[in-house]
Amino acid sequence: MKYKDLRDFIAMLEQQGKLKRIAHPVSPHLEMTEIADRVLRAEGPALLFEHPVKPDGTRYDYPVLANLFGTPERVAMGMGADSVSKLREIGQTLAYLKEPEPPKGIKDAFSKLPLLKDIWSMAPNVVKNAPCQEIVWEGEDVDLYQLPIQHCWPEDVAPLVTWGLTVTRGPHKKRQNLGIYRQQLIGINKLIMRWLSHRGGALDYQEFRKLNPDTPYPVAVVLGCDPATILGAVTPVPDTLSEYQFAGLLRGSRTELVKCIGNDLQVPARAEIVLEGVIHPNETALEGPYGDHTGYYNEQDHFPVFTVERITMRENPIYHSTYTGKPPDEPAVLGVALNEVFVPLLQKQFPEITDFYLPPEGCSYRMAVVSMKKQYAGHAKRVMMGCWSFLRQFMYTKFIIVVDDDVDVRDWKEVIWAVTTRMDPVRDTVLMENTPIDYLDFASPVSGLGGKMGLDATNKWPGETDREWGRVIKKDPAVTAKIDEIWEELGL
């Protein structure tokens, strides 16, 4: 499914009946959230609000795109796959790139050449003239209030930029980092950059600040980027591969980049809107509270202030937005789809893993259920520790349930059956204190630091129990086949 940019993707969705245009005037203040939430819960289409209205009743100049990733199928489309199941192939590619195996022979080496050729042929293409710079606002012309920025929940402190793709670069680094961080609107040219300390953008900023304590730090924020680049920013791409290169691989065409007008950062040339600016030394502001993906309003905290010096955009740009709230929301749907990418990555490191599931009800990452082919006593605990430590995405996972491969991790009835019949609460529970936790998790005793629990719901091996272990009841296949043959005659 090849497409060039967000507009191309929108046209493809509309042609397939997967996008709905809303001509009725709708306010970004609460109303868009209400509509998008109802549509997402009904597994409905992406939405293009053509006439957003301001608080005074006048209209914004730009439409709002919402619920773009409201179904796993649309996430898969954005990643260039024709079904959610095909996302595992993307995971297999990432697993190979993360830890490539030496070829087993000449034939095996040649079989890998097409993949490697495809990957390296997708290096970004830098252009001089770009659609995203057709219109330029600078100086006093910069006015973030002219953008239809969504105010999602009644007790949110201010409008919030939600799908901003933040582009940064650390000192002495060639590769740029892409991250999605929410940004509170606090002034005509001011946003609060809420990035957690371990995230790529924050790390780049911290390194820069150590070497340049008095120098403004350049940042670019892309609004209305193509889906492949957005999804590349939230996928565990190996450090040897840039997100822009990975996006090209997903999209089936090289990512076109252009240098920002005011700094050396490169942004997608066909993006809708780009905010260029700096973070000044020691300029922070109190962020929040906001309703977030947990279903609660989060605590306030101080984060750096992003000063927007320039806004560039396409002719008639589209503003891309979303909301986060109690699952299901778009992040939860993204989690369901990206789950399929994670499975091959984990299996590469732990071949005994047969499936892995992040229940969307668990806020996409706070609980994981893993099935495995158990081979020895204590094996389940090894897998628990591996899942917590292997991918950065699972650093904040609070609960991991491990089951045998006869249990469907996506069926809660099966999982609860395993937990209640194969677990002893004392012997089979692993508890850890003072581990990294999402600072939005107000249940932890300290902000950013809390506990983890592992539940070993596997059958126990000698060494783990001295008792005779129960045998699973199974039907007689011959009797089942016989009853199948006469079932219609029974009239049941």
Swiss-Prot record:
Binding site residues for prenylated FMN: 180-182, 194-196, 199-200
Domain of life, source organism: Bacteria
Pfam families linked: UbiD (PF01977), UbiD_C (PF20696), UbiD_N (PF20695)
Positions of the catalytic residues: 292
Keyword ATP-binding listed: no
UniProt pathway: Cofactor biosynthesis; ubiquinone biosynthesis
GO BP annotations listed: ubiquinone biosynthetic process
A Gene Ontology cellular-component term: plasma membrane
Binding sites annotated in the UniProt record for Mn(2+): 177, 243
Annotated catalysed reactions: a 4-hydroxy-3-(all-trans-polyprenyl)benzoate + H(+) = a 2-(all-trans-polyprenyl)phenol + CO2
Topology in the lipid bilayer: Peripheral membrane protein
SUPFAM superfamilies xrefs: FMN-binding split barrel, UbiD C-terminal domain-like
Subcellular location: Cell membrane
Entry keywords, A to Z: Cell membrane, Decarboxylase, Flavoprotein, FMN, Lyase, Manganese, Membrane, Metal-binding, Ubiquinone biosynthesis
Enzyme nomenclature, EC number: 4.1.1.98
Cofactor: how bound: Binds 1 prenylated FMN per subunit.
GO MF terms held by the record: 3-octaprenyl-4-hydroxybenzoate carboxy-lyase activity; metal ion binding
Function: Catalyzes the decarboxylation of 3-octaprenyl-4-hydroxy benzoate to 2-octaprenylphenol, an intermediate step in ubiquinone biosynthesis.
Subunit-structure text: Homohexamer.
Family: Belongs to the UbiD family.
Protein name: 3-octaprenyl-4-hydroxybenzoate carboxy-lyase
Annotated organism of origin: Neisseria meningitidis serogroup A / serotype 4A (strain DSM 15465 / Z2491)
